[in-house]
Amino acid sequence: MIDIDDFKTINDMYGHAYGDVALKVLSEGMQKFFDKNVLLGRNGGDEFCIFLPDCTCADVKEKLEKFTKLKRSFKYEGEEHQFTISVGYAEYPVHADKPSKLMRCADTALYEVKLRGKNGCMAYKNGLRKDIRTQLGFALKDVSENLPGAFIIYKADNNDD
């Protein structure tokens, strides 16, 4: 699983058209970086999936770490803006024996990366907190409820749909 770090912030600061540009930059980068036998897909929102056939977590660790560290950017009002990604991955049948469980394991690893500061890559390990996404949601809810008067100003521009 691949997720653009702070994607909501990109949409809120620059507009959804620029969020779409970031999605396109990432998807084109995936197509260039990974071999033709790799299945690439968009899971929804800013989340992408990669299915690497006939390999183990150990086999792909270095490649995924390298992909995570590639520079990615989009232009907004003539200026280059960098963005990063986080990657979580799991291995069939070591971590899960069904596709949906495998995706949950990769998602758990992905959200562990997010909690550790983002812009990283991690394989699923037994013992990772399965409820990590829920915990992250509660943390964000707690922050929003305890910051009275905090709000986001969003200004649409001509490139925003």
Q: Which residues does each PLM region occupy?
A:
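Cyclic nucleotide signaling catalytic output domains
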Residues: 40, 86-94, 101-116, 122-134
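Nucleotide second-messenger and two-component phosphorelay signaling modules
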Residues: 2, 13, 28-39, 75-78, ...
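Conserved long alpha-helical elements within nucleotide-processing catalytic cores of c-di-GMP signaling
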Residues: 5-35, 41-45, 49-53, 57-65, ...
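Catalytic strand-loop-helix junctions within cyclic-nucleotide turnover domains
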Residues: 51-60, 77-80, 85-102, 127-128, ...
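Sensory modules in modular signal-transduction proteins
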Residues: 138-159
